[in-house]
Amino acid sequence: MVLRNNWYYLLLVFLMISCENKESKFNISQVFRYNEHSNISSLDPAFAKDQRNIWAVHQLYNGLVQLDDSLRVIPSIAKSWQISEDGKVYTFSLRDDVYFHEHSLFGNDATRLVTATDFEYSFKRLLDKNIVSPGAWVLQNVKSFSALEDGVFQIELTQAFPPFLGLLAMKYCSVVSKEAIEYFGDEYRSNPIGTGPFKFKLWVENTKLVLRKNPNYFEKDTTGKKLPYLEAVAITFLPDKQSEFLQFIQGNLDFMKSLDASYKDDIITTEGKLQPKYKHLVHMETGAYLNTEYLGVYLDHKNNITNNKLIRKAINYGFDREKMIKYLRNGIGTPAVNGFIPSGLPSFNNLEGYRYKPELARKLLQEFIQETGIKNPSITITTNSNYLDLCEFIQRELQNIGLDVTIDVIPPSSLRQGKATGKFSIFRASWIADYPDAENYLSLFYSKNFTPNGPNYTHFKNIVFDSLYEKSISVVNNLERYKLYQKMDSIIIEEAPVIPLYYDQVIRFSQKNIEDLGINPIDMLDLRRVYKLN
């Protein structure tokens, strides 16, 4: 593995030095190296759905706005904006110093200033049914958008939606060049031209992706120095997590994001701390992650025992989440003993949810048996292999209270399809926020969002919940909206269409010479201010 990695490293050096004669002197020590476990499917922001795509696209593109590490919406290409009193019209004033990455397709100047017309084109493209972008839903509440002037872009919503700016921070809404799209056609996925801190250099699919510093990037640090600091980003595609871990420990990768069962006990303790033997080599950082891991219960199955709330509550009380996190996740994650909304959001509901109460679980199970006459109740949990250990833990715990559990392990693709079609009575799932607002989580339980046309995988339906949800999406005042969110969250806990497992945490390992990497609740990899100590 070391020889293979060194060969690619030498290739990287050769390509960068030989092809960049017109650019500033290249410093190979400022190359940031990380690994993805599978190939990136596209470098087109219209297809920035999976994290591996999003991370690469984030280095290449900008949108109107962005999120800081505290999830506040801050300017990007839009330097300022105004929102109408009714909350429907957003008017953005654009910077006049943002240029597309240099390319001969732009003619003699090799680049072009970004204008409001580019955003108009980019948004139309996102909605184009021929493109089939998975991000078209972001603009489903948009009535119209237009370039009022070169430096002014306006969006009108069908109805007010306070989290809308957070939606615009998604990578789907990045600006692209019409000339580049028309020039490359279907090959644009592998020939991206954006405005971001890094520009495309080389992509050997399934092997390596290389991005180079954009010398014309518009953002500066607080001292006025141009960003980014790094010279390049090099991404490898080693599928084996154990191999990635070895490459990281040997210093051939600067950063590692995953924690796999094959090495988790070697690198961190059961309390979630870095093992002493690595403290002089590695920096570890953890933080809240907008991801709730849970078991979903499909409520439209006729004659299934999980339609009965007594069973769903018995499951929720019947296993020890704290023990599960400590021994199976080495303390990485927070037991989901409150609501469904994760702890990284300001509207997190500090209500008393489900804690381990085996006696209460047994009591609820006996009530179910007496009520239904079913003497030996049993359930099936469907999962993929990545979460088998968690499901087996729950299986053992529930069998101790008298509930028989079968685990069905299937491929991830089959699990996704089965969830969407109501095939499974209980399924393991997770919900990672697309934007930093609890509406993102509560939309999973709105009755008009039933799958396959929406994210309501459980087919939960509650008149009071729906009324609160419809009211909340137009409330501009954050505190008032958060109170409505918490009421909805309380209904979810009481009715138990889901079994919350834990609120996830971001975990990042980096080499000791990596500075200012940072961490955030949406687990975005932001490399603009990262640098490497020599």
Task: Identify the function of each model-found stretch.
Residues 20, 310-313, 325-328, 406-416, ...:
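Extracytoplasmic/peripheral linker and loop segments enriched in polar/acidic and small residues
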Residues 35-85, 124, 131, 193:
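N-terminal lobe/hinge region of extracytoplasmic solute-binding protein
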Residues 82, 118, 131-178, 199-204:
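Surface-exposed binding/hinge segments that line
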Residues 115-120, 196-197, 227-232, 250, ...:
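Alpha-helical secondary-structure segments
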Residues 160-227, 232, 242-243, 359-363:
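Gly/Pro-rich hinge or "lid" segments in bacterial periplasmic/extracellular proteins
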Residues 186-189, 217-270, 404-406:
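Ligand-site clamp/hinge motif
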Residues 198, 334-368, 387-389:
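Structural transition elements
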Residues 257, 334, 366-433, 506:
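Ligand/substrate-recognition segments at binding pockets and active sites
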